[in-house]
């Protein structure tokens, strides 16, 4: 299976691919992780899926979406600032055109079970966010993520460190932290083939 990485903003994304992203997010966040999220017609979306959002996503040969990220500028509303400000402790939420929030990272479970390609999809998505950052002048990503993803980042040597109160928080059933991921040569080396 070939993995194609695509990038689009909210206004330009093809409708079938956008539905594929929302369907994957429903499968991962609502069904697998059992997050208490509003969904309709087996699709998960929220108020941050708006004209400020960009998407980096993976499709297979059949154009099925099997991995995705949502990117939000920190100059407007974004999840860490608006939904999870308590995770910041005494720290002020980043507000910088060169800092972008990553959210709704999802990789389809069926991809890894059927053809063992989840690792390839995951790595290609991380390569894509690195390349996107370099091309757009992004100097740092911030994200509220699971400690499993934090461990994964450390294992593949993507630079990251906890910010905010630096504590582990239970968000739904997911043990979560706030991470900063600086865009630097270490990140490039970690995601290079």
UniProtKB/Swiss-Prot annotation:
<dbReference type="GO" id="GO:0009372">
    <property type="term" value="P:quorum sensing"/>
</dbReference>
<keyword id="KW-0455">Luminescence</keyword>
<keyword id="KW-0673">Quorum sensing</keyword>
<comment type="similarity">
    <text>Belongs to the autoinducer synthase family.</text>
</comment>
<dbReference type="GO" id="GO:0007165">
    <property type="term" value="P:signal transduction"/>
</dbReference>
<dbReference type="InterPro" id="IPR018311">
    <property type="entry name" value="Autoind_synth_CS"/>
</dbReference>
<keyword id="KW-0071">Autoinducer synthesis</keyword>
<dbReference type="InterPro" id="IPR001690">
    <property type="entry name" value="Autoind_synthase"/>
</dbReference>
<protein>
    <recommendedName>
        <fullName>Acyl-homoserine-lactone synthase</fullName>
        <ecNumber>2.3.1.184</ecNumber>
    </recommendedName>
</protein>
<dbReference type="InterPro" id="IPR016181">
    <property type="entry name" value="Acyl_CoA_acyltransferase"/>
</dbReference>
<comment type="function">
    <text>Required for the synthesis of OHHL (N-(3-oxohexanoyl)-L-homoserine lactone) also known as VAI or N-(beta-ketocaproyl)homoserine lactone or 3-oxo-N-(tetrahydro-2-oxo-3-furanyl)-hexanamide, an autoinducer molecule which binds to LuxR and thus acts in bioluminescence regulation.</text>
</comment>
<keyword id="KW-0949">S-adenosyl-L-methionine</keyword>
<dbReference type="GO" id="GO:0008218">
    <property type="term" value="P:bioluminescence"/>
</dbReference>
<keyword id="KW-0808">Transferase</keyword>
<dbReference type="Pfam" id="PF00765">
    <property type="entry name" value="Autoind_synth"/>
</dbReference>
<dbReference type="GO" id="GO:0061579">
    <property type="term" value="F:N-acyl homoserine lactone synthase activity"/>
</dbReference>
């Amino acid at each position: 299976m070939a993995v194609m990485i695509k990038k689009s903003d909210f206004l330009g994304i093809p409708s079938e691919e956008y539905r594929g992203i929302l369907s994957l997010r429903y499968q991962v966040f609502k069904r697998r992780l059992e997050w208490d999220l509003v969904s309709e017609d087996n699709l998960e979306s929220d108020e941050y899926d708006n004209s400020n959002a960009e998407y980096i996503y993976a499709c297979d040969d059949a154009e099925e979406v099997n991995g995705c990220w949502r990117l939000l500028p920190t100059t407007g509303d974004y999840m860490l600032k608006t939904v999870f400000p308590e995770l910041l402790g005494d720290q002020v939420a980043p507000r910088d055109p060169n800092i972008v929030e990553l959210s709704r990272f999802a990789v389809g479970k069926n991809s890894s079970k059927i053809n063992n390609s989840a690792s390839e999809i995951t790595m290609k998505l991380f390569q894509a966010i690195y390349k996107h950052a370099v091309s757009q002048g992004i100097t740092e990503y911030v994200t509220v993520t699971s400690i499993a993803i934090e461990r994964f980042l450390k294992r593949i040597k993507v630079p990251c460190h906890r910010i905010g109160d630096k504590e582990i928080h239970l968000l739904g059933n997911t043990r979560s932290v706030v991470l900063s991921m600086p865009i630097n040569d270490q990140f490039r080396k970690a995601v290079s083939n």
